[in-house]
Amino acid sequence: MADYQGKNVVIIGLGLTGLSCVDFFLARGVTPRVMDTRMTPPGLDKLPEAVERHTGSLNDEWLMAADLIVASPGIAQAHPSLSAAADAGIEIVGDIELFCREAQAPIVAITGSNGKSTVTTLVGEMAKAAGVNVGVGGNIGLPALMLLDAECELYVLELSSFQLETTSSLQAVAATILNVTEDHMDRYPFGLQQYRAAKLRIYENAKVCVVNADDALTMPIRGADERCVSFGVNMGDYHLNHQQGETWLRVKGEKVLNVKEMKLSGQHNYTNALAALALADAAGLPRASSLKALTTFTGLPHRFEVVLEHNGVRWINDSKATNVGSTEAALNGLQVDGTLHLLLGGDGKSADFSPLARYLNGDNVRLYCFGRDGAQLAALRPEVAEQTETMEQAMRLLAPRVQLGDMVLLSPACASLDQFKNFEQRGNEFARLAKELG
């Protein structure tokens, strides 16, 4: 465990994670300073009076006087103020690094462009089914530092590329990169390989690396080695097996579960299940309890969630599809009896939308594109696309057109922040309108 006594600690960014960092240091007899570029950041009213705070901008004087800077994942390491501090030899970490220095129980670490919240939650459910005292959080749910507990037997952490950038002490019992597709390109000016490099940090010092056999970008730089186990649709140690019209999860040639026993549906969710099973096996969880968890787990909100099935029409909320890869996963192998009414739009974060084009062929697809990058998305197939300013306008446009066998799918391939507070608000608004219009 690290000793922070006598250190001048500065925390950048409040919110729940920032507050967890403040509490962490106060519990160790260190009073940090806090700054946030927002004038009234969330959690400001919960800061103890003894903690100095600076809001509305970064305070370079504080930063250059610090011994340790704990930076929110929301601030880029390339920010001039952080670059200057790094050049001056000041240590810059994030909350995950603080956590890794303290955690006494094994850690399962999960990252990827898509599916990581589902897999993280699922591994947590597998641990609970085995009677293990487990802490689940990180980039979802509770911040990692709030999970620290002497009685915890296993930690399962979802980690973003931003969090991994400032983490160097992670030694996971099992770590995975589920997939790598373009995301946050506004934060990675050198492109996909720079983004991938941040993700690859998760494998450093990992006991087992769980890689995606269908995605070479998830492999360690030196390629697969004896630490690696793989999952995939048709390839990998953990893969899908199709026989006589049925689909099975299979591990090294052995059929372990028929997917019809699972409440999750869709090929992308079956591969999520394989990844979770590989991680649970690597962490030493009993296979039987892991399989039991797979039969009871219903999935997470806003992730290919059926919010209404009425008059033979399914309305599906996939608002968590905030990038192209996630929407590709939703469309890959999608079965629709009638017409697919696909809602796309929002802030594309400088992504290339062209990989979606191959899923939009055929006579049974209609596109409804909205938000900041609606025009770019409509250009994928203009003859079947309509553009509106808002998602609500798009839904009111399509509602009179839906018929028996149709599907209305919100899988926007974009962030929501141009028109919504977050993807949850967007998904809730879709669900509300579906129930009104369906």
Curated annotation (Swiss-Prot):
Residues binding ATP, per UniProt: 112-118
Keyword Cell wall biogenesis/degradation assigned: yes
Catalytic activity: UDP-N-acetyl-alpha-D-muramoyl-L-alanine + D-glutamate + ATP = UDP-N-acetyl-alpha-D-muramoyl-L-alanyl-D-glutamate + ADP + phosphate + H(+)
Localization annotation: Cytoplasm
One cellular component term from this protein's GO annotations in UniProt: cytoplasm
The enzyme's E.C. designation: 6.3.2.9
Pathway: Cell wall biogenesis; peptidoglycan biosynthesis
Major location category of this protein: cytoplasm
Pfam families (UniProt xref): Mur_ligase_C (PF02875), Mur_ligase_M (PF08245), MurD-like_N (PF21799)
Entry-linked PANTHER family: UDP-N-ACETYLMURAMOYLALANINE--D-GLUTAMATE LIGASE (PTHR43692:SF1)
Family statement: Belongs to the MurCDEF family.
HAMAP family according to UniProt: MurD (MF_00639)
Stated name of the protein: UDP-N-acetylmuramoylalanine--D-glutamate ligase
Organism per entry: Shigella sonnei (strain Ss046)
Phylogenetic classification of the source organism: Bacteria, Pseudomonadati, Pseudomonadota, Gammaproteobacteria, Enterobacterales
UniProt gene name: murD
